[in-house]
């Protein structure tokens, strides 16, 4: 009986490690997707800026205004998606705090970047700027956000460097 319990505990431990690895891979996938979309949205904003050069919001056609409204909404939705990923990271960090402090520390670094730079807030601000035809400012913010997302991705992708085993 004791041997079976030992095997069961070991299997549960291994299953937990596999689950943790899957969670990390999911975080990498999700942050990579958000970063890729952020870069696409930045390119779209840049094209909007070129197309509307020298015109105020009042001088835009209804279709152009609607196009900017949709672009701003997409940016805001992407901010919400990032918040969802960060919330999942927070939960995982709490679970790992005691049993795997190194992995919890890696997640803390990633979360800290997002919080210190107020990434989701900046993304929402960029969305509002797009809707208000403040495309130059929106572009700068989008570029900064993308750079921070790439930093987060780098930390997550290289987490094995932080491990001692």
Language-model features, listed with the residues they occupy:
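Extended alpha-helical rod segments
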Residues: 1-165
């Amino acid at each position: 009986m004791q041997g079976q319990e030992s095997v069961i505990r070991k299997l549960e431990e291994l299953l937990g490690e596999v689950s943790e690895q899957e969670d990390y891979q999911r975080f990498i996938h999700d942050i990579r997707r958000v970063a890729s979309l952020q870069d696409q949205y930045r390119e779209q904003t840049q094209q909007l800026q070129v197309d509307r050069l020298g015109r105020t919001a009042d001088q835009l056609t209804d279709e152009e205004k609607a196009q900017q409204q949709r672009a701003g909404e997409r940016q805001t939705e992407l901010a919400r998606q990032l918040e969802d990923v960060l919330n999942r990271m927070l939960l995982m960090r709490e679970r790992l705090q005691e049993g795997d402090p190194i992995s919890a520390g890696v997640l803390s670094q990633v979360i800290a970047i997002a919080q210190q730079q107020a990434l989701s807030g900046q993304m929402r601000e960029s969305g509002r700027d797009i809707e208000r035809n403040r495309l130059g400012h929106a572009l700068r913010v989008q570029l900064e956000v993308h750079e921070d997302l790439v930093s987060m991705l780098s930390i997550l992708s290289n987490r094995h460097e932080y491990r001692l085993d």
